[in-house]
Amino acid sequence: MHVPFCLKRAMSALNNMRRFIEIMKYGLSIPKKGALDFVSLGALVHRLDPGVIPFRKATECAIHVSGGEFNCAANLADCFRMQTGVVSAMVDYPIGDLIAERVRAMGVRPFYKMFKHNGVNGPNMATVYSDCGQGVRAPVVFYNRSNEAAAQLKPGDFDWKTIFSGGVRWFHSGGIFAALSETTGQLIIEGMKAAKEAGAIVSFDLNYREKLWNIWGGHKRALSVIAGIAKYADVLVGMGTEGGLQKGLSTPSPEVDKKSKLDPSVFSAMIDSIVNKYPNVKIVATTLRDVHSTNHHSWGAVAWVDGKTYVSPTCELTILDRVGGGDGFASGFFYGLLTGENPADALKLGWAHGALLTTFPGDTTMATVEQVREFAKGGSARIQR
């Protein structure tokens, strides 16, 4: 059958408009294709975990490979079956070998700057010490980041054009990496600029680690560094009332302490000032967590997407290991956005994956995408036969 040329042009224009509308969801132009769906920039670490035993009495530890930025890439690869990469430092000694093996096992493509260990004092892959706590006893976290290789990373260390040569859809970094040194924040900005040139969406996790920032300037320095990074971000995550945006981009309000940790109005009040200051930001999302005890949390999430606020359901969590729950939320939320879910459903996927992640030992996921979708739809803990 002959189709008139004018009709062909009209059909072509309609298809192009449909593609444009699909790509322009959330106020963002998310690339539909790329060799890498997601690339994160950050430090790789190993976490020593004695479980419920405090370190002063511990006789054995599990070893978890982690990194706030890496965890998102690992979760997206392992649970959500996406093509991801991590840009980081690696050291040629047994701890580096252990970490590199776990990165490969999670299905994440590595882009490393290699450092040579001198056999005595480094450079090193950082060690995080974190017990799980129990009941009324809170978890305790401390670090050995002496002569850390990742803290020595600087602009010019990576060939971004090569890393992004096959196309990249999403680039991510975070406040933990920004806190390591003067040059890591500069490298984040360099990576963000290169990612934007490659057409990628850029996100930043506002996670705030007071112990890390106190080494070189404290809260005032954190404000300066994170504010400089935020102006390049399309998406911000991690602004819960425990830290994040509340300490990273604004002066804490006394009203925060007067309201429930699950009250989304706290989030909404902060959003107005942030998006006015950073009009480049189109999406902001965070978990809402009320800690009743180490093992019992109330869990929710909230997102602001292109001018509209969305709130997740709330559930009660029995916590096995809380480390990585926020990264679990972020990665599930990113997955929803990358796959074109509507904002409410993307938020539920993040909420569900973050909740499930707290039921596993370690910092990265053991969930399947089917489990996440089932829980997001209101699934229960009934046995599946």
State each model region's role:
Residues 22-55:
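Positively charged, low-complexity intrinsically disordered leader regions
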Residues 57-66, 310-324:
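Short pre-catalytic strand/loop immediately N-terminal to key active-site residues, enriched for Gly-Thr
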Residues 64, 71-83, 105, 336-339:
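Alpha-helix C-terminal capping segments
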Residues 83-175, 372-385:
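Conserved N-terminal subdomain of the carbohydrate kinase-like
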Residues 84, 110, 202-204, 237:
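Hydrophobic beta-strand scaffold residues
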Residues 211-306:
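Conserved phosphate/ATP/ADP-binding segment of small-molecule kinases
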Residues 294, 313-379, 383-385:
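Conserved post-catalytic alpha-helical subdomain immediately downstream of the catalytic base
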